[in-house]
Amino acid sequence: MIILGLTGGIGSGKSLVASYFNRFVKAVVFDADNVVNNLYNFDNNVIELVKSYFPTSVNNGVVDKNDLKHYFLLYDDLWIKFQSELHSIVWKIQKDFILSNSRRVTKYVVLDVPLLIEANYHNCCDFVIHVKANSILQRQRLLKRGMSRHEFELISRLQLSDNDRKRLSDFTIRTGLSKNFVVSQVKDIVFQIDSRVGCKI
């Protein structure tokens, strides 16, 4: 089993790239954003964790994500402590996900994790792929999601620079030109990896 980690700025197209690995080489994808969403929605322990740090963000046992975002945008010591606890929960779920797939006939696992390198999730990867888009396209994508400029700038500050990501990665995929171009890069990376590990799909 080969573990691929995706790193890239917010709005760079990591989820698109992950979906193409799933489509073309049947990779199983660990989507950390989706995991966190499910934790906020359904995990009573995480809901209680949120409530213990940010009481106004839980109403009738439901996490108010808009209210929680307010605390994220403050990004103070309280948020950092909460985030550390949440990351440890996500890390365990990721480990269980990898272990579960290692027991199956799974060729590729793709980790679609924000702050992959910054939070040291890349340490369990065989290869790291840098997903890159130009800053104008990133902003356009995020505006469509309804993200504020302040939120975009905060998240950008928390992330490594593109130069650092590229230096710490094995491959780079550029998004934004066309979907066919992204697909060709995915297939080329699969070919290179298979050549290195001596196996074929």
Swiss-Prot record:
It catalyses: 3'-dephospho-CoA + ATP = ADP + CoA + H(+). InterPro entries: Depp_CoAkinase (IPR001977), P-loop_NTPase (IPR027417). ATP binds at residues 11-16. Pfam families: CoaE. GO terms for biological process: coenzyme A biosynthetic process. GO terms for cellular component: cytoplasm. Its EC number is 2.7.1.24. Its main location: cytoplasm. Pathway: Cofactor biosynthesis; coenzyme A biosynthesis; CoA from (R)-pantothenate: step 5/5. Keywords: ATP-binding, Coenzyme A biosynthesis, Cytoplasm, Kinase, Nucleotide-binding, Transferase. The keyword Nucleotide-binding applies. It is found in: Cytoplasm. GO terms for molecular function: ATP binding; dephospho-CoA kinase activity. Residues 3-201 form the DPCK domain. Belongs to the CoaE family. Catalyzes the phosphorylation of the 3'-hydroxyl group of dephosphocoenzyme A to form coenzyme A. This is Dephospho-CoA kinase. It comes from Ehrlichia ruminantium (strain Welgevonden). The gene is coaE.
